[in-house]
Amino acid sequence: MPLTIRQALREDIPHLCHLMKELSGHEISQEEMNNRLEFIEDSPFDSLYVCEENGAILGLLGFRIRENLEEVSKYGEISVIVVDSGARRKGVGRFLMNYAEKLAFEKGCIGTWLVSGFGREEQAHPFYKELGYEITGYRFVKRF
């Protein structure tokens, strides 16, 4: 059966928590994930999608529309992308990235971008480069 993408639902929360733990290495409670889904549902700019095959959730895509004031344009931000460790190297990540690019194009964006942290140079970064993404800068963070 082919891969499909749909909006994330409340009943997906246990799977979403699992995928986010695979991405970050940290547990996220179902309550916290529910809060994040509520935020996304209330936002006109944010969306959360799951990728399925035969009803099994294999991946997660967070997508956000970002206004770029410097260029007076919009970009589609891939705010989260994660594929279940048991489904990697099977086209799920590429399918999700293609979907994000299609969404961005349909919403009048001039491109897509994402942030990928240190420690992902072996797998994620070559994958993004293969898809045509370029490293264009650094992200600076100050935690409170």
Specify the residue positions occupied by each region the protein language model found.
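Acetyl-CoA-dependent GNAT
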Residues: 7-11, 18-73, 79, 143
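Short hydrophobic/aromatic beta-strand or adjacent loop that forms the aromatic wall/cage
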Residues: 46, 135-140
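Conserved active-site alpha-helix within GNAT-family acetyltransferase domains
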Residues: 94, 118-137
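Conserved acetyl-CoA binding element of GNAT-fold acetyltransferases
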Residues: 73-85, 138
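Conserved GNAT acetyl-CoA-binding A-motif
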Residues: 104-116
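Conserved acetyl-CoA pyrophosphate-binding loop and the N-cap/start of the following alpha-helix
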Residues: 87, 91-99
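Residue-level recognition of the GNAT/N-acetyltransferase active site
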Residues: 9, 66, 84, 88, ...
